């Protein structure tokens, strides 16, 4: 099937840094000769300048056109529909590389213009809501015009090597397939960075580490570890197994959560007295009898001593199994970059690495008690020096 990829926000930072370079690799692979790209922009743009600056790819430049429109005008979406002129053998992927505050209204306009036929798919970046209530509202709004199987919610951590390696091992190794409390003492998932917030002051001040990483990325990775893989299991029901695992996790206890902020953060965001956490760690438990008694912990932070994305399985015999992105990426088994893989799977209609509505809502339910406690300042906010080790904060 021919594919038209429509990118809302093609001139933005994410598009230049991630999407266009990923598309360069895809078109150069030769596997998707029937792919064309339509970049939606509020102002006229030079295709060659935009694409070649980001990718230095003449091939991608030739496959890309710019459609200029006002994102707040309903009639412009009708113009877009007519411009795309989708045929029975074509599909359209609507990639919303836009701020979350704009996404819901764009979806409304797209649906109202009739751009919601079965061969049209929506691709969203996180965050999927600011809290449980806003997530429920956003899911309800997208559901007015689009069915769940048309909606592809992107958590790029699910397309990274760590997630792929866990899935691979758990589906081929009998021991990993039967992970549980008989052999495992604890599971720790860590995403640490050496950098601070850089140029994301406004976003981070509104979001914080709990919302930015734990509610989404790390909770999804945890579900891969905890999910039941008893037959009949196929990769296509992966989301169903992830959700079942999430449903067994008890809502988080604020007394088992830690928040901290690196020294200098308040000056960076020009908000002296800010209580936004740049480090968050949440201890969890599962009601699943296979995981009863196993300590679960999700940890993330900025301005720490090292960059690490890892899942650490600690066994009762004192050994451990570490799924570390840096180690996996150094092998010959390296996968395509996350955004490249996301786009390829969306084109092919394979949804197993995308996050479903029920998963999003359950993840929010789990972290809500911690979120509310931190908003009420019921939990101390400690400070740490940039370059601190994770274990020194825990």
Task: Show which residues each predicted segment covers.
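Secretory/organelle targeting and membrane-embedding segments
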Residues: 1-123, 128-394
């Amino acid at each position: 099937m021919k594919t038209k990829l429509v990118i809302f926000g093609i001139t933005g930072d994410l598009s230049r840094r991630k999407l266009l370079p990923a598309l360069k690799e895809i078109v150069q692979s030769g596997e998707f000769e029937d792919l064309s790209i339509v970049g939606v922009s509020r102002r006229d743009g030079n295709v060659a300048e935009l694409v070649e600056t980001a990718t230095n790819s003449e091939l991608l430049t030739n496959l890309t056109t710019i459609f200029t429109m006002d994102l707040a005008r309903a009639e412009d979406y009708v113009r877009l529909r007519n411009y795309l002129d989708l045929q029975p053998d074509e599909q359209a992927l609507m990639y919303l590389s836009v701020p979350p505050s704009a996404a819901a209204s764009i979806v409304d306009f797209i649906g109202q213009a009739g751009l919601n036929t079965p061969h049209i798919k929506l691709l969203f970046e996180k965050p999927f809501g600011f809290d449980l209530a806003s997530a429920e509202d956003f899911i309800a709004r997208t559901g007015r015009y689009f069915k769940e199987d048309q909606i592809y919610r992107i958590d790029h951590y699910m397309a990274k090597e760590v997630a792929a390696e866990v899935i691979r091992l758990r589906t081929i190794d009998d021991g990993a397939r039967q992970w549980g409390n008989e052999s495992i003492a604890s599971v720790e998932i860590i995403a640490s960075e050496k950098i601070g917030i850089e140029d994301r002051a406004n976003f981070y001040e509104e979001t914080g580490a709990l919302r930015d990483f734990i509610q989404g990325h790390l909770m999804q990775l945890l579900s891969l570890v905890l999910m039941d893989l008893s037959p009949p299991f196929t990769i296509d029901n992966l989301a169903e197994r992830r959700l079942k695992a999430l449903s067994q996790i008890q809502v988080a206890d604020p007394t088992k959560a830690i928040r901290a902020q690196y020294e200098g953060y308040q000056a960076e965001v020009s908000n002296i007295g800010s209580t936004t956490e740049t480090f968050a760690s949440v201890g969890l438990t599962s009601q699943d009898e296979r995981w009863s008694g196993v300590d679960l912990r999700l940890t993330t932070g900025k301005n720490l001593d090292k960059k690490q994305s890892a899942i650490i399985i600690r066994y009762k015999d004192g050994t451990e199994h570490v799924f570390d992105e840096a180690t996996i990426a150094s092998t010959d088994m390296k996968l395509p970059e996350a955004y490249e893989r996301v786009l390829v799977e969306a084109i092919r209609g394979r949804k197993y690495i995308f996050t479903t509505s029920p998963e999003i809502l359950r993840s929010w339910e789990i972290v809500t008690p911690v979120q509310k406690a931190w908003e009420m300042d019921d939990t101390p906010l400690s400070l740490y020096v940039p370059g601190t080790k994770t274990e020194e904060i825990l």
